[in-house]
Amino acid sequence: GIRCNFDVGDGVISRFGFDTETEDFDKVVEFVKETSNVYLVNLQCHFAKRNVEFWGARAKGMLDVTDRVASILGYVPDRIDLGGGIFGNMEKDLKRQFGSPIPEYKDYAKAAATLFAERFPDKKPELLVEPGSALAGDSMKFVGRVESIKNVRGKQFVTMLGSQKNISMAGINPPMKIFKNGVNRT
C-alpha cells in the first residue's frame, strides 16, 4: 500500500506518507505500474485531528488520489483506508473539556462514507477506518500513586508515579476518582 499525505485544512503538516502533490508520489505509482509482480492493494491516509469537519476533506482527498492512481494503473486499489483520528465514547466531564460537540461514529460515516458510496455504488473498493483508541479508550483505568500535590497561582498540580502517556499533557483531563487509604474522596 501507499500512505498518502495531503492538505485537509486542519493546519497540521504531517511527516508521514507521500505528499500526493510531489514527484516522489508519482515515482512510487510509476514503479507499481512498471513492475509486473507488484500490485497496489491499498491507499491509506491518517490525520491527527479528530474533528468530523476534516473527514469530508479526508474522503475527498482520497477519492481524488484514487482517481489519479487508477488513471495511471488502469485499476482501483482493493482498499481505501481513511486511517484513524476518531473520538470515542467518553464521560460528560471529559466531553465538556473539548469546547465543541463530540461527534458520534455515524457523523464520521456521513462525512466520509457517503462520498465513497456515491462514487463507488458497487461497494468496491473496500473502505476502511482505524478506530483504535476510539474503541479502546474508555475500556481501562489508570491507577497510580500520588507523589505530591501543589498549588500554583490557584491551579492544582498533582504529580503521580506513571507515564505522561497515561494522562494528557494538552490540558484535557480524563474523569478521575481519588481514593485515600481505600476511601473514595471524589
Stretches with model-predicted labels:
Residues 15-17, 85, 134-135, 145:
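Residue-level preference for alpha-helix termini and adjacent loops
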Residues 78-98, 128-139, 167:
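Flexible glycine/acidic-rich beta-alpha junction loops that bind and position SAM and/or redox cofactors
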Residues 20-22, 90, 139, 182-183:
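Solvent-exposed, flexible loop/coil residues
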Residues 111, 117, 122-186:
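Charged (often Lys/Glu-rich) extended helix/loop segments that serve as interaction or gating elements
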Residues 1-79, 88, 115-120, 124, ...:
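Active-site-proximal beta-alpha core segment in soluble small-molecule metabolic enzymes
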Residues 103, 114-115:
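Repeat-solenoid scaffold signature
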